Amino acid sequence: MRALLLNSSPHGEASHGYRLAKEMVGTLDMQVVERDLVADPLPPISKSYATAVTSGNHHGGVFDWSERVIREVEDTDLLIIATPMHNFTVPAALKLWIDHVLRINRTFESTSTGKVGLMRDRPTFVLVGSGGFHSGERARQPDFLTPYLRYALESIGIQSISFILMQGLVGGDASVSEALSGARSALSRHVPFNRVAPVTA
């Protein structure tokens, strides 16, 4: 069994979402593959890539990076994405990963009724950190991240998606502790994390 942990926070290993994801996945009997999308950024989508997608000419290694990150997903049984919310949606580093993974006739096909995913479904957890509130009674801003990322993942065949929110992270130590405790509790109610003793530290 293998898990893929993606970190798209500019705070790297100091990110609250990454640290919680690392903590929780550490309770599982799984090999963990990590990709830091900020510290080790993917190359931008180039003209040659765009031309190859539209023309069907796939020669010259133009899809090498795309294939690499797609296979990382294909080879895993559990996907965890630790991401901040930047300006109401996904950060640029995660958007670039999405652009490499969503590729017509490779991870999805286009039909008369819309995109059909070509990848196997797997449990996917998205840990979303935000300084403010975008869900619940204290929400003061819209959330475009959740519907966008859900639609993007569903379009390639990943349907089993859980969003774990960590809100109010700029509100001081008490607010951070409350957010992490709630996120940890939410994760522990889901398979495979509910099969191990909950971490309370």
Regions found by a protein language model. Name each.
Residues 104-109, 158-160:
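Short, structured loop/turn "capping" segments at alpha-beta junctions
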Residues 76-77, 122, 158:
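Short, well-ordered alpha-helix to beta-strand connector turns
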Residues 10-11, 131-132, 168:
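Short, glycine/serine-rich, charged loops/turns that create anion-binding
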Residues 136-201:
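Glycine-rich phosphate/pyrophosphate-binding loop and the adjoining helix
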Residues 82, 127-129, 165:
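Short beta-strand segments
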Residues 110-155:
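Short, glycine-/small-residue-rich phosphate/pyrophosphate-handling segment
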Residues 1-106, 185-201:
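N-terminal beta1-alpha1-beta2 submodule of the flavodoxin-like/Rossmannoid cofactor-binding fold
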